[in-house]
């Protein structure tokens, strides 16, 4: 119902924008005019972009224009545009002709608000030279990124570009590098979000790759370094744009993109919702929303959610939904490395980052992709002071030559490093298995977890009973009795609890209440670490 209302509101706002653009086209004047009239004519020309014919072509592709996208993303009337009159400076290949000059060039830039909170935005205009990046285009983007860093506000890029403007040669490449430098400078200081709403190829792909989150639109957005024609000429592979760099490819196979949405309107509405979880900068807290879900709410269904059989799967997402405010969970990368779950939720109105093993996929084992996915998310949360809640059910790291040859040792160390490095409040709940090195990695007490809980169903041990018995009781006649002895001594929460490695063994139904209470206490947490230029994470 809420989603339908958002789409309806977005549709109404879009119709207003379309009427204003049609009016802009009719108001253009070719007669000699005063300075004020020239200013107004330039302004109207900028609003029209590449012209009505190209706007219509954009709509026929199922895509909105650059300005329509900004209008739907930002609060009504909040957009303040900058550099509307900037034009490209290229004089080669006939580019100096008036017909090839467009006020604002091929990108719309400025600032506005999302639910009243400041944000800087650029939206590439495919109706002007296919949204290609010129020196002026890059200059406009760099200017708002500099402003965003100065005031401490996020940057959102709406990407829809054919790539570098070939007519400008190396100046276009220099423009990309200028943007990349600012992406790196802003990393960990202000949130950076890329929404791919059309083609994004060649050097252009590295800016989204450097931002914190990359979202795509199904069927109309593409990300690749070299297109299908080049791939065919070099490797003789036949591949379509969609197969090579479409939303499905990057959200399920490569892990380059974090989520994909049905269309432009759906993407922009979800981006507004997602933005509400984030702080404006690393100096500002994430917004605290009024919470009507009692912080001390008990969740009785959690007492029976973990099966008695340790090999039987269950859905960790059900536990997450049951614990967080209003059952609302914005999952990140839901279709990639499904054996680990990451995303944002709220606890008592505060934004939290959620990490959890997924027993339904590969029994929740950690592998290369899930380790990298989890590490990237944990580091973002730590950069922006977002508390971490970790739900653990992990039997270990996935064995096999593919994992070893792929570098599971190095990649698994990334997740370990991320949790150990994080100084935000860290609350861990072991729901069932926590075996071997994977127990250590998943925000254990040994990696400075602030509060670590175990459910009565927890099994905290070096390995499972079957494998342990084969080593400890090798040649033992009664294997079942040996396994029962091992489980009694080790595969339960008590050995860890008596050593202080978990702070308490709690009833699952009390999990929400305990976490909310802990987060209140940990809100003032401060940690001092030794000075260093920067850490050397095992990339």
From Swiss-Prot:
The keyword ATP-binding applies. The modification N6-succinyllysine is found at residues 99, 474, 489. Residues 32-533 are annotated as: Carboxyltransferase. Residues 1-28 form a transit peptide. Its EC number is 6.4.1.3. It comes from the Eukaryota. InterPro entries: AccD/PCCB, AcCoA_carboxyl_beta, ClpP/crotonase-like_dom_sf, COA_CT_C, COA_CT_N. GO terms for molecular function: ATP binding; propionyl-CoA carboxylase activity. It is found in: Mitochondrion matrix. Residues 325-358 are annotated as: Acyl-CoA binding. Pathway: Metabolic intermediate metabolism; propanoyl-CoA degradation; succinyl-CoA from propanoyl-CoA: step 1/3. The modification N6-acetyllysine is found at residues 99, 474, 489. The modification Phosphoserine is found at residue 71. It catalyses: propanoyl-CoA + hydrogencarbonate + ATP = (S)-methylmalonyl-CoA + ADP + phosphate + H(+); butanoyl-CoA + hydrogencarbonate + ATP = (2S)-ethylmalonyl-CoA + ADP + phosphate + H(+). GO terms for cellular component: mitochondrial matrix; mitochondrion. The beta subunit contains the carboxyl transferase (CT) domain. The holoenzyme is a dodecamer composed of 6 PCCA/alpha subunits and 6 PCCB/beta subunits. Belongs to the AccD/PCCB family. This is Propionyl-CoA carboxylase beta chain, mitochondrial. It comes from Bos taurus (Bovine). The lineage of its organism: Eukaryota, Metazoa, Chordata, Craniata, Vertebrata.
């Amino acid at each position: 119902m809420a989603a339908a209302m958002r789409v309806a509101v977005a549709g109404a706002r879009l119709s207003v924008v379309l009427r204003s653009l049609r009016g802009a086209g009719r108001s253009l004047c070719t007669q000699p005019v005063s300075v004020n009239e020239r200013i107004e004519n330039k302004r109207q020309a900028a609003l029209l972009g590449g012209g009505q014919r190209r706007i219509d072509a954009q709509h026929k592709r199922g895509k909105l224009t650059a300005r329509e996208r900004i209008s739907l993303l930002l609060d009504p009337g909040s957009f303040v545009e900058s550099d509307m009159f900037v034009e490209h400076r290229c004089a080669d290949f006939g580019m100096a002709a008036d017909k090839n000059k467009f006020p604002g060039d091929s990108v719309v830039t400025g600032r506005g608000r999302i639910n009243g909170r400041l944000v800087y935005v650029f939206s590439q205009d495919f109706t002007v030279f296919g949204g290609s990046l010129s020196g002026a285009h890059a200059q406009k983007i760099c200017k708002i990124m500099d402003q965003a860093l100065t005031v401490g506000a996020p940057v959102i890029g709406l990407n829809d570009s054919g790539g570098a403007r070939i007519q400008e040669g190396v100046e276009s490449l220099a423009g990309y590098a200028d943007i990349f430098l600012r992406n790196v400078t802003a990393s960990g200081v202000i949130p950076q979000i890329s929404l791919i709403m059309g083609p994004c190829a060649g050097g252009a792909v590295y800016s989204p790759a450097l931002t914190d989150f990359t979202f795509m639109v199904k069927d109309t957005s593409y990300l690749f370094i070299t297109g299908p024609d080049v791939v065919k000429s070099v490797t003789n592979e036949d591949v379509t744009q969609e197969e090579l760099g479409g939303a499905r490819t990057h959200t399920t196979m490569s892990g380059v993109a974090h989520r994909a949405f049905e269309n432009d309107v759906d993407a922009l509405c979800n981006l507004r919702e997602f933005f509400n979880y984030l702080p404006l900068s690393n100096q500002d807290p994430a917004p605290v929303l009024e919470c009507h879900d009692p912080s001390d709410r008990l969740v009785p269904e959690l007492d029976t959610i973990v099966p008695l059989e340790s090999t039987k799967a269950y859905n960790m997402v059900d536990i997450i939904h049951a614990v967080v405010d209003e059952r609302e969970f914005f999952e990140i990368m839901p279709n990639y490395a499904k054996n680990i779950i990451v995303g944002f939720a709220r606890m008592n109105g505060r934004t939290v980052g959620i990490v959890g093993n997924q027993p339904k996929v590969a029994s929740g084992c950690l592998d290369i992709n899930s380790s990298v996915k989890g590490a990237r998310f944990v580091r973002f949360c730590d950069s922006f002071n977002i508390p971490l809640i970790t739900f653990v059910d992990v039997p270990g790291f996935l064995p096999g030559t593919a994992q070893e040859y792929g570098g599971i040792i190095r990649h698994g160390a990334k997740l370990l490093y991320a949790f150990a490095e994080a100084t935000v409040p860290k609350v861990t709940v072991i729901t069932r298995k926590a075996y071997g090195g994977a127990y250590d990695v998943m925000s254990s007490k040994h990696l400075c977890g602030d509060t670590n809980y175990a459910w009565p169903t927890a099994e905290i041990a070096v390995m499972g009973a079957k494998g342990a018995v084969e080593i400890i009781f090798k040649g033992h006649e009664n294997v079942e009795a040996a396994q029962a002895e091992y489980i009694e001594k080790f595969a339960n929460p008590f050995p860890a609890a008596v050593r202080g490695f978990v702070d308490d063994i709690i009833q699952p139904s009390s999990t929400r209440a305990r976490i909310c209470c802990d987060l209140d206490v940990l809100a003032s947490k401060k940690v001092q670490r030794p000075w260093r230029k920067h850490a050397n994470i095992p990339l």
